[in-house]
From Swiss-Prot:
One of its GO terms (molecular function) is mRNA binding. One of its GO terms (biological process) is mRNA alternative polyadenylation. It comes from Xenopus laevis. This is Cleavage and polyadenylation specificity factor subunit 6. Residues 169-180 have a biased composition (Polar residues). InterPro entries: CPSF6/7 (IPR034772), CPSF6_RRM (IPR034769), Nucleotide-bd_a/b_plait_sf (IPR012677), RBD_domain_sf (IPR035979), RRM_dom (IPR000504). It is found in: Nucleus; Nucleus, Nucleoplasm; Nucleus speckle; Cytoplasm.
């Protein structure tokens, strides 16, 4: 019976499956290779989209061997060529990049992705652009590096792991240098704070999706124009001069490997103003400042960033032109102590300087003991504590400083005080006779305070008026207290009667409870005694029974 059944050969298709694995094994290995290398090249970021990475070998043509058949099965029919565009400022938007590409005659943009920092969404300074034709990619490679975008010339490279890692390393180096420069007090990125909001229409809000791997930010130029100069591992950023600078000299050549900076624009128009220089305490007014803030990205609605600040207006004044001013709190970038201070009537510091740490130059009337700076032993430059005696409320000593009054003014104020006193006394007496003691007392207190606040309160005649008002006040208060005591006595009598009634009720209740309690106790005792008697009788019976 078993011989008649057709046996199913479960090993019949093993050979085909092994052949299929051999056929598609290379594809699986390529995908695994891409997955392994993506985190190391992107510094832990998400891997790139594989739809253009798979077409990389066919589009670039640098790793393709002629005559070899690719093992990858392509599902995307259209052509897609990806390029990296780097050396961009962090405030460059996708619209800026799109306009620059369209100006070259390239209109087949498929996608633009900016590489952003996942922590704060700030651009790293390079982006990925996808076009659909080989001619467009060649135009971008040849013509786009010649165009300037926000004062910098972009760099266009093929889309592969090598250039991606180079751009990532460059963004990390620039971020580290910017952190060192900001830690030393020098503003590297365009603006004091690197966490400024993006201008409207920026990345992520344009016409293209902007999701991309994160990383460190790519700050913009350190000056009015060109890119920040790179520093080697053993070098530190240049320190500013610690003396008043002279007229600006011609700019030096750019460092190797960087494009030429753009020509500096002319002075600003009538509607524009350059950023104000930072004012430090102890710096002469009108003297060129040591550190001038570079222009940052354009604020919303103000167009491109303005030009550089104009050259300084003339040489610095001689040291004896202004009276000396005590030095303020020491800073990392403060001026040398031999510089004279601003004049006493000069303007306060610039609005972006905290006035709590940089006092305005209007304190020339202070004594020499109070106007000294902080002691040199204080490493943080904290100012000495203020003496509260100068800021306390005015006391009796202020009466001496008051200007003397003329006879007419004195008589006018005295007549006014007399009228206030007489009207207050008459009104208080009428209110007290009507039984409204509160209104009478309030009227007299108000009149006394008004006369005490007048300019002639120290005169003897004013003191007589005040004493008469106070006597009237004491009399009305005694009457109000007497009537109140009578009322209180009556209320006390009522309260005593009520409390007596309550106490009687309570005592009667407590007595009843006490009697009930004792009755219950006596009953319990009687029951207990009865039980004891019964037990004794039982014991006696048992003894009698045993003796028999």
């Amino acid at each position: 019976m078993a011989d008649g059944v057709d046996h199913i050969d479960i090993y019949a298709d093993v050979g085909e499956e092994f052949n299929q694995e051999a056929e598609y094994g290379a594809h699986d290995q390529i995908e695994l290779y891409e997955d392994v290398l993506s985190p190391s090249a992107n510094n832990g970021d998400a891997p790139e989209d594989r739809d253009y990475m798979d077409n990389l070998a066919a589009s670039v043509g640098d790793d393709v061997v002629k005559g070899s058949v690719p093992n990858i099965v392509y599902t995307y029919t259209g052509k897609r060529i990806a390029l990296y565009i780097g050396n961009l400022t962090w405030w460059t938007t996708d619209e800026d990049l799109t306009d620059a590409v369209h100006s070259l005659g390239v209109n087949d943009i498929l996608e633009i992705k900016f590489f952003e920092n996942r922590a704060n969404g700030q651009s790293k300074g390079f982006a990925l652009i996808c076009v659909s034709s080989e001619s467009s990619s060649k135009k971008l490679m040849d013509l786009l590096p010649k165009r300037e975008m926000h004062g910098q010339k972009p760099i266009v490279t093929p889309c592969n792991k090598q250039f991606l890692s180079q751009f990532e390393m460059q963004s990390r180096k620039t971020a580290t240098q910017a952190g060192q420069m900001s830690g030393e007090g020098k503003a590297g990125p365009p603006g004091i704070n690197a966490r400024l909001p993006f201008p409207p229409g920026g990345r992520g809000r344009g016409r293209f999706p902007t999701s991309g791997p994160g990383g460190d930010r790519f700050p913009g130029p350190a000056g009015p124009g060109g890119p920040p100069p790179p520093f080697s591992a053993g070098m530190t950023p240049p320190r500013p001069p610690m003396c008043p600078p002279g007229p600006p000299g011609p700019p030096g050549p750019p460092p190797p490997g960087q494009p030429l900076p753009p020509p500096l624009p002319g002075p600003p128009n009538r509607g524009e103003r350059p950023p104000p220089p930072v004012m430090f305490p102890g710096q002469p007014y009108g003297q060129p400042s040591i550190v001038t803030l570079p222009p940052g990205p354009p604020p919303p609605g103000y167009g491109p960033p303005p030009g550089p600040p104009p050259p300084q207006q003339g040489p610095p004044p001689p040291p004896g032109a202004f009276p000396p001013r005590p030095p303020g709190p020491p800073m990392a970038l403060g001026p040398p102590p031999h510089l004279p201070g601003p004049p006493p009537g000069g303007p306060p510091p610039a609005p972006h300087v905290n006035p709590n740490f940089f006092p305005p130059p209007g304190n020339a009337g202070m004594t020499s003991s109070d106007s000294r700076g902080p002691p040199p032993s204080d490493p943080y430059g904290r100012p000495p504590p203020y003496e509260r005696g100068d800021y306390g409320p005015p006391g009796r000593d202020m009466d001496v400083v008051r200007t003397p009054l003329s006879e007419a003014e004195f008589e006018e104020i005295m007549n006014r005080n007399r009228a206030i006193s007489s009207s207050a006394i008459s009104r208080a007496v009428s209110d007290a006779s009507a039984g409204d003691y509160g209104s009478a007392i309030e009227t007299l207190v108000t009149a006394i305070s008004l006369i005490k606040q007048s300019k002639v309160s120290a005169d003897d005649r004013c003191k007589v008026l005040i004493s008469s008002l106070q006597d009237c006040l004491h009399g009305i208060e005694s009457k109000s207290y007497g009537s109140g005591s009578r009322r209180r006595e009556r209320s006390r009598e009522r309260d005593h009667s009520r409390s007596r009634e309550k106490s009687r009720r309570h005592k009667s209740r407590s007595r009843d409870r006490h009697d009930d309690y004792y009755r219950e106790r006596s009953r319990e005792r009687e029951r207990h005694r009865d039980r004891e008697r019964d037990r004794d009788r039982e014991r006696d019976r048992e003894r009698e029974y045993r003796h028999r």
